[in-house]
Structures are given as C-alpha cells and as structure tokens.
Amino acid sequence: MLTSPRLILLLLAWVFSALVASALVKKDWTITWEPGAPNGQERNMIKINNQFPGPTILCDEDDDIEVTVHNKMPFNTTVHWHGLERVNCVRMMGTPWSDGTPGMSQKPIEMGQSFIYRFKASPAGTHWYHSHSRATVLDGLYGPIFIRRKPDAPAPWHLISKEQADIDAMSRAVIDPKLVMVSDWTRFMSWEYMAAEESSGMAIFCSDSILVNGKGSLYCPDVDVLINHTSTYMKYGLYPRQVNDKGCFPFMRSTQGPYLTTGKPETIPLHLQHGCTPAEGTNETIEVDPADQWASLNFIGGATFKTIVFSVDEHDMWVYEVDGHYIVPQRVNTVHMYAGERYAVMIKLDKTPKDYTIRVADSGLTQVISAFATLRYKGGIQGSDSVGVIDYGGQNSTKDGSVITLDREHLPPYPPNPPARKADAMHVLSTHRWKSAWQYTMSGHGMYEEDRSAYGPLLYDPHSADAMDEGLVIRTKNGSWVDLVLQVGSLPGQPQEFPHMMHKHTGKTWQIGSGMGIWNYSSVEEAIAAEPHNFDLDTPKWRDTFVTSFDGSAWIVLRYQVTNPGPWLFHCHIETHLAGGMAIAILDGIDVWPQIPAEYGPDQRGFMPGTLPELESGGKQGTVDKQCPLLAVSPSGGPKKDSGETSASDSRWETLIRGLIQVLQGWLSDEASSRSS
C-alpha cells in the first residue's frame, strides 16, 4: 500500500514524464456527404474536411491524440482506429471508449452530433482509420495513420545492408515514409451494394476501380484482354465460363456454396456485376529524391473486399514492417495484401532517374482489374516507360518467371517476441455461411447483426443479455492467455470458402499454427503433439489481421494475452462479410472491467457533463440545416469561447488533470478496499 507522500511523488513524476515525453495532437474533423469523382465517375461520397481519403494522422509514439468528429452527414457514423491499442498510461488502463465501434464502445454518432476520441499513439508504425458503422467504408470514410518510433527502437536495417551509408539512409527514410493507401471503389452506395446482395442472395465481389491514395480510373479493356490476363488457377476453376466485361468472375460454388442454384443474379443492378463504362480520373504520383538513397513506401490495405498484389517496376522491395511491426526483412518483387493489412517496404533509389510504374492489381481471386501510380525520381525523365513483373490481372509477366513473392507464412517479428508456450483458455470458432451466400457466422452459432447493441454498448453493461450471449460473446480474464481456433469449411458440402481477413480490435495476436482439415483436438497442446510441423511457438507471425485458407477445410490458431480490458470486436475485414454478420464480441478482462470517465458516459460522447453541444439534425445530399457548434472542454468542465483558442498546453493540462483524477480515484478505492479487509 502506498503512503500519501509516496503517492504524491509518483504522481509528480508521472506528470513530469508525460510533459516531456509526448505531445498532444489535436484534430478537428467535419465529416460530410457530398459529390466526388475519385475515378472520374461522379457519385455522392464521404469526405473529411473536404478531403478523400481523409487527413493523415502523423505523430510520434506515445503522443496523446484527440480527434473531434462532427457528423454533418444524413446518416450515422463512427471512426475506428485500426491497429492502435487504445492503451493509456493511467494505471495501465486502456481507452476502450475511443475504439469507435457502435454497440461495443459507443453509440452511433448521429446526424449533427459530435464525438471526441482520445487515445495514445501506440503502437508505432503504419495504421489507418475507417468508419465502423454499417458498410460505409465503401463510401469513402478512411485515411492513413503513421506513428514514428522512438529513436532508440531496435531496427532491422543491418539485415538489409551492412553499409553504414545505407543504414543511415534507411534510418532517415523510415521517419518520413511515402504512405500509399490502396482501396476499391464502386459507383454504388454501400446500402445499394448490400441491397443487391440481399435481393439476389449472392455474394458479390465486383468493383469499378482500384484507387491509390484516392485516385484512379475506370478501365474497360476488351474482354479478350481480360480473359488473357485471368490466372491459370481461375481459368481452370471457371471453365467453360469466363470473366465478363468488367473483369468480374461468374458466380460459382466456391464463392456461393450450395446457394448458387437458388440465387437471383438477374436482380443485380446494371453496372454493379457487369456493364463496364470507362471513366478517366487521375493517377497518383509519388516523388522521391535519389539523393536520399533509400525510400520507404508504406502500403495500407484499405480495400473493402479486393485481394491486392503490388509491385514497383525495376525495383526490388525489402518488406520490413507488417501491420505496423518490424519483421526480419524479406527482399521481394511482389506483395499480396488483403483488406486491413499494411506492408512497409524499403526501395533503393539507385536506378536511372525517371518515372517508374507502381502496379496495383487484384491478385486474381475476385476480378481482373488494375490500378497504376507513378514513382517519380526528382529531376528525372517524366513520362518514361518501365518494365513490370505483373500484368493487368496481377499475374507474373516475366519471361523466365523469376518473380519473388513475399512469403506470408514466414514473417518472424524483429526483434523476436514469442508468446507463452501454453494458454489458459481455448475457444473454437466455426466460421461459415449462414442460410445464404452473403450472410455469415463467425462463431457457428448465429450472425452478429451489424446494429446489435448499437444503443446499448457492451462497455456500459457487460452483464446485459447481449453481453451474456455465449453463442456470440467470449469472456476472458485479465492477464490470461487465450487461444482462438478459427475453422473454415466445416459444413458438409461446403469445404471451400473465400479467404476471410480476420481482425481483432485492440492490438496484435500471434498466429501459432495452421493446418488443413477439421479441428478435432481438445487442446492446442494435443494438436501440437499430433502435428508439430504445423505450429511455430518461437517465431510466429505477430499482426492484427489474419487470412484463412481458400484451399478447402482448414484451421488457424491465434494466441494472445489479455492486457487491455474492454469490449472488442473480432470480425472479418471484408466489409460485406462483416455487414453480413461475420463477427463476435470478445469481452477481455471481464474481472477488471474499466472505470468509465464522466466525459465518456453513455450519452456524453467525450464531453464533460453539462458541456454537450446542442443536438442538431442533418440535411440531405451533403447539406445540414445548421452548423454544429465546435466546443472545446476546459479543465473545469465549462465551455471555452472558441475551439481555436485552446492551446496545446491548455489541452495537455486538461489531459493530465483528467488522468490525475482517475489515478486518485483508483488509489482511494484501493485504500478503502484494503482498510475494509
């Protein structure tokens, strides 16, 4: 038990360290619904401060982030911070109220409302943010996050080059990367896309364009060209059918299961699945200075359902970071990237100064489609041709087939950080379609409805009926090690499923094993004894997004330690699969549930009691009836005259005072408990 003087000294030390070690990064975002044409084809879309993709959050590790979101759209929204842990330094307590997941950590941000998200910039690396309300990622609410590491963080540059000049150049490049956000785009609004799936009963994977940093075009090559660029694997699977004029694949059993014969594809609107109309937009140009010697390109998988492969003409890529964490670098020519994933690559700037094409294509699983960007050497020849290693369909285009692709199964973290050798609990999840081709269950016990608990978030009542549903909710204890076994292809007659990109909110997990067939083990230890070649407990992948197999019945085993109590969504990151019910809730650390600050009470939205902005309703087609007031919160809880008058130091003290109050409340609670016992 701490004495009062000792407690005061610790609090003062904490205040001092917080002041000197981190900065406050404040963002004020207005989210609107307005016309845009990122691929040359106009439609209404989501913008943040009139930008698409949204503004980049650039900060240093452990900075305090505060993002005030004003919803001026005619529908609800939230913002999720993908890859961030929502960990706070206050009594090792997390910030689950800022996760941005309706039904879990907050209520939806309604039309005309504002919400303040506050969290630590942790962990370092490449991340992104996106909407988590319905399927509106399809409408454009997303943007990049980059968190610079501390200067003394171990780095793997010596594994790429032994030359000190190269190591120094890479050390400079990593703190000023070129962010490359890759997304897919369609002329149809998210609700129109989902309505097409529901009415047809089909799982649809067709897009109009792939965008690079929000730019691209709608290409319509001849069908013969599209057929020629279809992968051999897909040609075999499609025979005797073939791709259509959009490069989209016909519906088949591997993607529709037994519901192929009962679907109604004729109800799908023209231009969604077929009917290509070209539109010309612009392509992204990324300029690099050859005097820098090396450049870091940080790719972000913001696609909603596309499986991407990318390359840079005439340049090898050293993959050194995966989902924000360093790995033992791999030298490659191509990288396959799935929804939600991030890959940072180093490239040496030692080629002839000119333009080189960055090729971004569907890997061949859902569509024959491509996008292009330009890597431009400063002072070089513009508009010049370059030689690629993949074609329009994302397939190997070299004469000798000598293309090195990232080995996704072997991504040892750098430095090594192996998990515990044994877990305390195991949960087996049977993931499969649920009564239709486009609806899914992640648990095997039912769909997780996209609006489930939206106005009764589990954070505020972890013992509600929704929170106690054992078919859709996992409950864990703080500090315990948990194994999640994901089984696909377990239903009779449905051995094959489209790959699912599984993402657990708040932090990374280890993939310690994977194998083909049906999981029939009572424990992971039993499985390791039977199939030791399918497990790795020494250098397993450590990331926040994992991909299941497309090759038939298969399983993967994920292991993590519960260190951040709160309600977290675990779901497939294919946006249409999530909207179709592919999720579960994990209530981590149910035995030490977080104390919720007053400003994050059920209806406070980050504002102290008594300072909430007046609720105003949104209008239609990107307009609102009135402007929402922008309101900053002072330490006393009263409103300031104008948010622009709030200095960083004022807000820093605001944060510190809030933290001190929470520490004191916790200490007093501990004191009372110890005295009563």
From Swiss-Prot:
Its EC number is 1.-.-.-. Residues 31-150, 179-379, 469-588 form the Plastocyanin-like domain. It holds the Pfam family Cu-oxidase_2. It is found in: Secreted; Secreted, Extracellular space. Cu cation 3 binds at H132. Glycans are attached at N76, N228, N283, N396, N478, N520. Residues 1-23 form the signal peptide. Keywords: Copper, Glycoprotein, Metal-binding, Oxidoreductase, Repeat, Secreted, Signal. Cu cation 4 binds at H503. GO terms for molecular function: copper ion binding; oxidoreductase activity. InterPro entries: Cu-oxidase-like_N, Cu-oxidase_2nd, Cu-oxidase_C, Cu-oxidase_fam, Cu_oxidase_CS, Cu_oxidase_Cu_BS, Cupredoxin. Gene3D superfamilies: Cupredoxins - blue copper proteins (2.60.40.420). Might be part of an extracellular enzyme complex composed of GIP1, aurF, aurO and aurS. Belongs to the multicopper oxidase family. This is Multicopper oxidase GIP1. The lineage of its organism: Eukaryota, Fungi, Dikarya, Ascomycota, Pezizomycotina.
